[in-house]
Amino acid sequence: MDPPSLDTAIQHALAGLYPPFEATAPTVLGQVFRLLDSGFQGDGLSFLLDFLIPAKRLCEQVREAACAPYSHCLFLHEGWPLCLRDEVVVHLAPLNPLLLRQGDFYLQVEPQEEQSVCIMIKCLSLDLCTVDKKPVPEPAYPILFTQEWLEAINSDFEGNPLHNCLVASENGIAPVPWTKITSPEFVDDRPQVVNALCQAWGPLPLEALDLSSPQELHQASSPDNQVLPAQSLAKGKGRTYGSKYPGLIKVEQARCGEVAFRMDEVVSQDFEGDYVALLGFSQESRGESPSREAGTSSGCTSGALEEIAGTKETPLFQKILPLSEANEGPSLGNRACTKPESSEERPYNLGFRRKVNLKAPTHNSERPPQGSYMNVLEDALDCASGLRAGVSQEPAASKMQGPLGNPENMVQLRPGPRQASSPRLSPASPAAAASETKIEVKTKERNGRLPKPMPCPSRNTSSPEPPTPGLKFSFLRGQRQPSVTPEKASLQHNGPWKVLCSLYSPKPNRAKSLGKAGTTQTKTSGPATAPSPLTEEKAALPEASAGSPERGPTLEEEPPGPEPRIGALGVKVFRSRIACLPGGRDRAGRPLLLVSTTEGAWEAPWCTVSEVTKLLSYLCTIPRPEDKAKGLAVLIDARRQPPQPGLVSALQATQAQVPASIRAILFLGEKEAALQLQTLPDVQVEVLTSLKALSHHVDPSQLPAVLEGPFPYCHTEWVHFFQKLDPFLADLHQASSLLQASIEEFEKADPPGGMQEATRCLSKSKELMEAVLRDPGLLGLQREGGATLARLQHDASRLDFSPDVRSHLAAATALYSLVDEQLHVLVTASNSLLGKLELRVRLGRLEAAIHQVSDWMEQEGRRCLQSLTPKDGSLETVEKAHAEFENFFLQAAAQYRRGLELSKQAAQLGATARGAGEAERAEFPELAAFASTQRAFQAELTHFYMAAERQRTDLETLLHLHRFCKRMTWFHMDCQDLMAQLRLDKTSRVSPGDQRRLHRYLQRLASEFPAEKLAAVGLQVASLSRAGLGQELWEEARIRHEEIRMLLEKALTHSSCPEAPAAHSARPERRGVAAKGQGVSVEVTSKGRWDQPPLDSLGMDHLPKSYWPPGPPRGEQNRTFQAGSPPQEAGQAAEAEDGKGSHKLPDPAREHLLATTFFRQQPPRQSQVPRLTGGSFSSEGTDSQTSLEDSPQTSPLASL
């Protein structure tokens, strides 16, 4: 599908869904832009096929079902239920979630699978933090816009009931009660007015009338008044039309379950090319003009429309009221309906049809401010974010309305290779251009020139003009702004051009918010194919300034050349018919310049030699270049009146100003009157006394009616054509020169290599592009260039007998296409340069960030790794080193994550570079160097992080080993306490309770310190990065574990196999010696019992403190046994044995073994160590301590 057809299809679909489209365009286009950019990557064809067409089918199905109960009603809002005037109800893109409140929801059409869509209902979730969405089931579509549907939704909804639906307009997002949306409004409150209207006017369209005033209605219905009642609309411009019926549409009865929308019939009725206004629609309360409204819909029946289509046409120039140059009052063209050949050939958009009144400007004329379509697109961007958008308005006392009735005036969504271009000026179909060509032009005040249309009484035709080919310029078309203030320019900076670049640029994010209103010009160096024709002027101003208006600072402006400009001519002398160029040729092929001496204008005070010279000089520049080379043949008609003396002087001045422009003079008159002409140099003068003699030099078929020839010529139409053509060509030339200079600026040099230079060049390039796109001339062409060209083509169709008109129109068309191509080339060149500069800036920033991370690793990182290397030491030393390393590791991890992100960005940049062509990669040799830098940095980053992780693991392993050994020591001390309590040296048999305690300790040894765990700790120690680290500590823990096991096992064996009493009493002195050798003070009481020595006398203070950290004294545990105060059970057993008189002493050998085992040097016990978590080798729990039942004081032996 070619781009124009794609644009037309998209715009027709949108206009059909959301009429009137001019009212909904800001919102809908904003949503389309966001969806096209986010979901379809700027691919307009995929957007159309995969989303818009299925969405259109679905929405039409919903609309038909909603409208079915109102088949005989006339809707106040023709877009119901999808939109309410300018408020969009069913959205195409998600809204800003921050605007949702409890009880609010909105409906959105979302794409599903390929070429399928569904309607989603979206509202706040229960936590009010996210947006929940739920698809509307297909069976619910027929009842979607009913109160019952929402009640069914609320019955299944857990949160607050939904009651407000969010609608979007150019004013922002607003909640509307669902009851209001589901209750359509109808036009049924003024039936008597409508009936009176139909009786008085029959098939007259309702939208042409203002029903607010009975006097105006009576005046409109007057038979002798030839001005349609639309004049009352212009007269009542000061009133508010908010209570009228905007956008009427008739819903006719169709088949069962189907509603027929007869918009196409209404739209296809073209009132001689005039844009039909909506009935009484205005937004003056919002600062907008009725001329800004769109959407033609008639309240009459289809039969009335057909009757309108069958009415006899009246030529446009017969319907224009005569204008008086002295008093230029308001006038309106009488409108008649014409029906085009077929609705298929004339694709109109309902929403963009405008009313254009033919009205001469007056100094005291007051009009409401009119917003151009540029403002509509600005609002579309603001509405895309769901926020309030201020619409900037321009006062337009006398503006030319650009035609917005065509889809070509809308957004062009271009797929394929031309996406890199900016808005295109591509040709439109002839049928599509026909809607632009039939235009009743408002006079406009532009560039200091006030236009004034003139009637043409000689033009009388009753058949409509055939459609003529037309062109279009992008979708930014509307009213030409006469001036743009700096404040306006700043407001427009982020306007539609950003959207344009995002749609047309190969890289959507490359568009850099280019402005729309600026002050830049350049030298005029475009193709000099045609002179600049006439500018419209007001009759009260005899002359207007030549050239274009001031546009602020220029790049390098040069004068357009020595050719006379139409702006230098007086309007009166130009229209006076004293000289004209009908288009005929003499027999030598030279253009005929007809000079009449009978016109009364020769006597007017404004008809001076200077003015006539300007006129003749300008006319000499009109013919084609090949005809100008032959020179002109001036035919002077002096049959009734001899020429004025000033004519000869004007001819001489013209010949001097434009050398060789006049080659022959054919003087039709008396010979005596031509004597003065003989003085002209290099000019052949032929005096002809009759028309028959003239036929020898000029074929009679080449003579106009004033010389009794059949050659068709209407001077007024010819003047109007060149008055429109000349400023249009001047703008095209200037725009072409500006674009060409900008293209050369972007393509002249390679981007700089350094990051700072690239940043400066990037900023300058953006400023240059912004200045170009803010040029008022270029903006004017974007808004109304296509419409102007279409009007020129329409006017040229009535002047197609003139080869000069045809050549100028062809030149304008070619220049228009050239500007379009230059605009495309400029955007491509700008994108290319900006891409290169952005790549270099990104490379520089990435390199700087990479160097920063690399420097941190080399300096701070390496220093901390070296200073916090794991070493053998006490528990406090290891814990301190571990805590410091954890703080350092947080910094290292942050740097590592930053390095990973930089590596990811570098990889993406490399992938982008690899995806580019060989030529582009060759332009960036630094990409190869950056790739090697990125690989080296990634390797360094990985190595550093692995080293930090390894060192962290070593510290955690060492810390875990210390804590494991500490728990082993506590358990060993508990075993010593147990042995001291049991007094195995004193009794020959151990009670069953003591045996159970020994068994429990063995079970604790097996559960808390199993062999598997001991082996795992050994493997962890062996895995340390430095050989020998922690080995000594591990060996001591292993030996301690073996000692505990052997001690418990021997004690259990001793309790099960007691020794003979004699064996215990054989060598009491030896036990005492052994105990004394261990530093233990053992005393025998009077009853012969062995007392337990105090715990402090076990020699624990003499333990080396290399690995076992000091702890608090164990006084709080109160495990010291005082002499003479043994545990209760042991005392009772001893007393029982004393009572029996069988006192036995322990075996000295066994006592010596127990003493040496129990009284090994032990460190003071510490308080409970807090558990540390987070490491890979964290402690499994608190340190092993004696449980409550094992505590010597809290759990005495009697409790067992």
UniProtKB/Swiss-Prot annotation:
Region annotated Disordered, chain positions: 282-302, 323-372, 392-491, 510-568, 1056-1200
GO biological processes: axon guidance
Compositional bias segments (type: Polar residues): 518-527, 1175-1200
Entry's Gene Ontology molecular function annotations: guanyl-nucleotide exchange factor activity
Domain of life: Eukaryota
Ranges annotated as biased composition (Basic and acidic residues): 437-448, 1137-1153
Compositional bias of kind Low complexity: 420-435, 1160-1171
GO cellular component, one term: extrinsic component of membrane
UniProt cross-references to PANTHER family, sorted A to Z: RHO GUANINE NUCLEOTIDE EXCHANGE FACTOR-RELATED, RIKEN CDNA D630003M21 GENE
Protein name according to UniProt: Uncharacterized protein KIAA1755
Taxonomy of the source species: Eukaryota, Metazoa, Chordata, Craniata, Vertebrata
Gene name of the record: KIAA1755
